Amino acid sequence: MTTLEAFAKARSEGRAALIPYLTAGFPSREGFLQAVEEVLPYADLLEIGLPYSDPLGDGPVIQRASELALRKGMSVQGALELVREVRALTEKPLFLMTYLNPVLAWGPERFFGLFKQAGATGVILPDLPPDEDPGLVRLAQEIGLETVFLLAPTSTDARIATVVRHATGFVYAVSVTGVTGMRERLPEEVKDLVRRIKARTALPVAVGFGVSGKATAAQAAVADGVVVGSALVRALEEGRSLAPLLQEIRQGLQRLEANPGLKESSKKPLP
């Protein structure tokens, strides 16, 4: 299944696509794979975070998960093996979230090539402004990986135009300026950010940072997709099942007022 097909399928069902985020190797190697099996029935796409020692864009929940995964021995090689195992479980698009340093440490061509071979669909690069290293972005695309970059409510229209010119797969709209984390309500600026991005690209737009339940999912569902990370990682940290949270979020994504023009008959039962 391609990325565009995954978003189109969700849209045909009258909802935004659900993109769960899980940290590779957290809470353990086996626990990660169990979590993947739990989220896959609800997921349209899946985002896998590569643990990193200095995750500037991540809030405390994901920082703790990364630290624990690294202490337990998770590495780029370990993440490669996990991506390969996840790919054996699903045909849904798989995106690797990675900071730039591991890419440079392994060598971009080797890093991108190995993750493509392992089954990754694309890479999300939160700390790479694409216009600062267009050659690296082009290399990833030539190898066959889609490239996803972040835009924030503070992004200017000129910045949006630059980023979408380099993006493939989808565009990641950050709901708040700051780090990842759970919030009770998303700022109203997220609607305007999605509108401004969609005015400049035909690519799907996914909103992330702050989605923690049905209400925030409904707010974020003005976009084509919604990324849920910290809330899932916190549930894993606390030893809770992920299914109740995923069911609640899927209900929020199904709200027709967040998807104008859809008919009642387009609704489908949740998993």
Curated annotation (Swiss-Prot):
Keywords: Amino-acid biosynthesis, Aromatic amino acid biosynthesis, Lyase, Tryptophan biosynthesis
Organism: Thermus thermophilus (strain ATCC 27634 / DSM 579 / HB8)
Assembly, per entry: Tetramer of two alpha and two beta chains.
CDD domains given in the database record: Tryptophan_synthase_alpha
EC primary class: lyase
Matches recorded under Pfam families: Trp_syntA
PANTHER family with a match to the protein in the record: TRYPTOPHAN SYNTHASE ALPHA CHAIN, CHLOROPLASTIC (PTHR43406:SF1), TRYPTOPHAN SYNTHASE, ALPHA CHAIN (PTHR43406)
GO MF entries: tryptophan synthase activity
Keyword field contains Amino-acid biosynthesis: yes
Active site: E47, D58
Gene3D superfamilies from the UniProt entry: Aldolase class I
Gene Ontology CC terms, in alphabetical order: cytosol
Name of the protein this chain belongs to: Tryptophan synthase alpha chain
Pathway connected to this protein: Amino-acid biosynthesis; L-tryptophan biosynthesis; L-tryptophan from chorismate: step 5/5
Membership in a protein family: Belongs to the TrpA family.
Summary of the function given for this chain in its UniProt record: The alpha subunit is responsible for the aldol cleavage of indoleglycerol phosphate to indole and glyceraldehyde 3-phosphate.
Catalyzed reactions per annotation: (1S,2R)-1-C-(indol-3-yl)glycerol 3-phosphate + L-serine = D-glyceraldehyde 3-phosphate + L-tryptophan + H2O
EC id: 4.2.1.20
SUPFAM superfamilies registered for this protein in UniProt: Ribulose-phoshate binding barrel (SSF51366)
